[in-house]
Amino acid sequence: MQLLSGPRFVSRLLGRKAQRPRSTRAHSSGALRAAFAAAGFAAATLAWAAGASAVASPVDRYPSAAAAYAVQIDGRLAWGRAIDTPRAPASLAKLLTAIVLLDKNWDPKSAIRVSESAAAMPAVHLGLRAGDSLRADDAMTAMLMRSANDACAALVEHAAGSFARFAHEMNERAHELGMSASHFVNPCGLDAAGQHTTARDLLRLAQAAYEYPAIAATVGRRNASIDTMAGEHLHFDNGNVLLGQMDGVIGVKSGFTSEAGRCLIALARRGPHEVWLVLLDSPNRWGVAAGILFEAFDLAAQSAPAAP
């Protein structure tokens, strides 16, 4: 399959003309820089190019992109909106769940039994039945790729016995990661009173999660097949449809609940450049993500030092 960049990928994916987030129309180096300046973005661009490691209030380059978003280019926070505003996490919380599970006495081959409560979890789910068993690593794959809540619940019950006990461990780990504006109530990211996070904290979480080889390998897969211990074969696709469709995208996680809206954390690498993107409540998250990543790599290439 031909890998596409920017809006062309969305055109093929959605079968309609792609729309970028509200931004520039020009792509040449001079025109793009002029557009930055005309829109009032020159100061943020210069700060990014100068090597600032953090920006307290990044430029809101894409006001229509999402309720909250953050864009980090080559380790520097470049653009964002409402990055410290509390938002529901949706299934992005499962990245923290995976970290806590892997930090425990993780045995990927251990048998995970599905309880009645796990089997009754709301969508998204695999359709596991009470009494089913599957390997821990297969349940982890389903949780991270498909956002399967039944697999998530089964893993958590096996590891901690209850959601409440596991949520306490999640909050301890979040504190260690510097996620000071986050609080978790359940491990699957379902809407719940008191459960909230921010775009800035989710950026920290995703980067920490990607340091775990088991997580990095899983979130970069386009599809997977697993078998229950009773021999039932299950096949599913990754919820992140950018994978395999947009050049350089290698992760990380999508999510949706009625309170959180459509959410996405994406990681893309092209040559020496790396872009992290967090979108929270973005109705057109795939088109928005494609447009932002396209322009982020454009900026990174322009700001790179000239070869000697």
Give the residues covered by each predicted segment.
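Domain-terminus/edge residues, biased toward the C-terminal soluble/receptor-binding domains
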Residues: S180-H183, D191-P308
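N-terminal secretory signal peptides that target proteins for export/translocation
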Residues: M1-G30
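Active-site-adjacent loops and short helices of periplasmic peptidoglycan-processing enzymes
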Residues: Q2-L4, A50-R200, Q207-P213
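Bacterial N-terminal signal peptides
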Residues: A35-A47
